[in-house]
């Protein structure tokens, strides 16, 4: 059974080769472009960051999805929060998020980023990065595998493709 992304690409290439042109809506083109050109900025805080690096390496190759890691928040539109967020690090996370260009998305990776994880009852741990920044996709696990991260990124791509209009707020789409 083929993946939906590949089915869409196959339909697109068939329509282009048969007719020579393509009819679509501007919203669909913008959604396609945004979903297939995500530029993530890593916010690796703990062991989940190692799995994120593995997903970007040659075996899983996130580049094939159009994702290119950027070192600056001003150049990125996706923040991957990977690991335990402490109270001391929370203001830095918010500052980096505020510096990102619109539209922007956040992926929370791992039990610690999702809800505090193993350190949930520690006095110094934020019980989920969604208390600091709005989160679009949660990837569970301790640590989640590279496959789980790739799956979470594909879910984010689906979410982005479903949006309409030039102004985007992922938290209002269902």
Swiss-Prot record:
Keywords: 4Fe-4S, Cell inner membrane, Cell membrane, Iron, Iron-sulfur, Membrane, Metal-binding, NAD, Quinone, Translocase, Transport, Ubiquinone. It is found in: Cell inner membrane. It is a peripheral membrane protein. Its EC number is 7.1.1.-. GO terms for molecular function: 4 iron, 4 sulfur cluster binding; iron ion binding; NADH dehydrogenase (ubiquinone) activity; NADH:ubiquinone reductase (non-electrogenic) activity; quinone binding. It catalyses: a quinone + NADH + 5 H(+)(in) = a quinol + NAD(+) + 4 H(+)(out). The keyword Iron-sulfur applies. Binds 1 [4Fe-4S] cluster. [4Fe-4S] cluster binds at residues 47-48, 112, 142. One of its GO terms (cellular component) is respiratory chain complex I. Its cofactor is [4Fe-4S] cluster. GO terms for biological process: aerobic respiration; electron transport coupled proton transport. It comes from the Bacteria. HAMAP family: NDH1_NuoB. NDH-1 shuttles electrons from NADH, via FMN and iron-sulfur (Fe-S) centers, to quinones in the respiratory chain. Couples the redox reaction to proton translocation (for every two electrons transferred, four hydrogen ions are translocated across the cytoplasmic membrane), and thus conserves the redox energy in a proton gradient. Belongs to the complex I 20 kDa subunit family. NDH-1 is composed of 14 different subunits. Subunits NuoB, C, D, E, F, and G constitute the peripheral sector of the complex. This is NADH-quinone oxidoreductase subunit B. It comes from Rickettsia rickettsii (strain Sheila Smith). The gene is nuoB.
